[in-house]
Amino acid sequence: MSETAKKVIVGMSGGVDSSVSAWLLQQQGYQVEGLFMKNWEEDDGEEYCTAAADLADAQAVCDKLGIELHTVNFAAEYWDNVFELFLAEYKAGRTPNPDILCNKEIKFKAFLEFAAEDLGADYIATGHYVRRADVDGKSRLLRGLDSNKDQSYFLYTLSHEQIAQSLFPVGELEKPQVRKIAEDLGLVTAKKKDSTGICFIGERKFREFLGRYLPAQPGKIITVDGDEIGEHQGLMYHTLGQRKGLGIGGTKEGTEEPWYVVDKDVENNILIVAQGHEHPRLMSVGLIAQQLHWVDREPFTGTMRCTVKTRYRQTDIPCTVKALDDDRIEVIFDEPVAAVTPGQSAVFYNGEVCLGGGIIEQRLPLPI
């Protein structure tokens, strides 16, 4: 069997990126089939409509391309391995990233295993904007060619073995090119907007959705000087650096500068705010990260110079990383950084190569 006749199962989401990925792989001579994953049991009509519409779009694309579409239900795995952890993090006052967890537990674990074992796949493929490069017998994860759409931040937990079994066709293209291909092919997904909701749960009203699973506890909003200036509806609805949705204006004595969340006192259920997006209380000189995943799976010891992102779409921050023990590192930024948020991920890069990352355990505040 030639390399190009190998079987690839494409994770079809009903979006434009996975649609074009399937076509690109066909052009490269692979034997292509699609798989639609259902990872959330509908609990309302709106969600049912979204999932049903996505499945219909995925089916329409597969019909157009002449490929088979399989479906699988990973709702139990999603609930146990993604959603419960997501809720636990929010309950603890942290801000998790469900997309990273979802890629780790569902797309590149449950899907990868199902495709290989049940469907006889040689590879899986997704519509992620990342690239892979094989160097010295190990697969590396590279940023997507379209720097505006690069999704390597969300895939840092993957091992070189998982990357070796995965193909990322649109990672070599820019988004407008992908849409143009879909339009030229007459695919129903060509003009479909990118999804921005929680991984697999969709674009629902987040506050209302979270409130179904975690009872909100209203509490005080106080300034860094200790003045009470309002009430929050639940700490879980707020994250460091947040400006919108606080329901407070400028103070009489102060400026009209907007208020930002600078800290959360989880024990006392207090939200702490300050004025100005570069208030010293919002700045960090570094962070401690844990639950580390290095793509090459080699243990990290000593120190290294690299760049880091503490949130998606952030400009790379030059930093020095130092191993504290097997599963914790200290990261010191070259310049202070705003809104470093516990629960989010710190992801490290050496140029185009994504080295891996970890969960931000604590930030190292700017000494005041």
Swiss-Prot record:
GO terms for biological process: tRNA wobble position uridine thiolation. ATP binds at residues 11-18, 37, 127. Residues 149-151, 311-312 are annotated as: Interaction with tRNA. Coiled coil: none annotated. Its EC number is 2.8.1.13. Belongs to the MnmA/TRMU family. This is tRNA-specific 2-thiouridylase MnmA. It comes from Escherichia coli O157:H7.
